[in-house]
């Protein structure tokens, strides 16, 4: 599914391996090196998602107890989707099927986290019925869109939560790449 205003995209324009999309810079400003992070919105069903997994941070102390999407940094030379699969194996001990990418409603190709750090996010699913939090998280839990709004999300993840809720409400739940 393609959404020119952002949202979920199936067919992706692929970046050369090891490169990252760059955010627009004002004229005359040198772009800083950007670290790419990948995140997973683990849904109960890629074809018609009703719930997604929220993960409560265990550390560092200033983020402990806040909720986020599982994921992590892309290593040099690693493709973003390969990094996503690796991070989910490491953090949650799961193998996933990767669905569509969730993009911002802006011209940016990734979600800004903080200066020098941006995140690309995909919907994913797994066949594992039970998911344990691992060492990175205090707990994980399945939430509906309404329940998700009651959680204390990391500030950079809130726009992603809102986009997921918007996509689910709009019935754009067919989240498998074509």
Show the residue positions of the predicted features:
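Intrinsically disordered, low-complexity repeat/linker tracts enriched for polar/charged residues
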Residues: 9-15, 20, 25, 30, ...
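A generic structural signal for short hydrophobic patches within well-formed alpha-helices
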Residues: 74, 148-149, 161
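Charged phosphate-binding loop/patch that engages nucleotide di/tri-phosphates or the phosphate backbone
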Residues: 158-178
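Active-site-adjacent beta-strand/loop module that shapes the phosphate/pyrophosphate-binding cleft
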Residues: 95-96, 100, 105-131, 141-145, ...
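Short loop segments at secondary-structure junctions
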Residues: 44-48, 58, 125-130, 145-147
């Amino acid at each position: 599914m393609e959404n020119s205003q952002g949202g979920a995209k199936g067919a992706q324009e692929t970046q050369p391996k090891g490169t990252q999309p760059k955010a627009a810079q004002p004229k005359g400003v040198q772009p800083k090196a950007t670290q790419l992070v990948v995140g997973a919105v683990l849904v109960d069903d890629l074809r018609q998602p009703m719930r997604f997994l929220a993960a409560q941070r265990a550390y560092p102390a200033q983020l402990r107890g806040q909720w986020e999407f599982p994921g992590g940094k892309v290593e040099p030379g690693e493709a973003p989707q390969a990094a996503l699969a690796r991070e989910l194996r490491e953090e949650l001990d799961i193998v996933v099927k990767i669905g569509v990418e969730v993009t911002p409603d802006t011209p940016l190709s990734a979600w800004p986290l903080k200066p020098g750090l941006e995140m690309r996010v995909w919907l994913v699913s797994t066949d594992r019925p039970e998911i344990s939090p691992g060492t990175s998280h205090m707990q994980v839990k399945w939430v509906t869109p309404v329940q998700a709004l009651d959680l204390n999300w990391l500030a950079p993840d809130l726009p992603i939560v809102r986009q997921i809720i918007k996509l689910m409400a709009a019935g754009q739940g067919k989240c498998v790449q074509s």
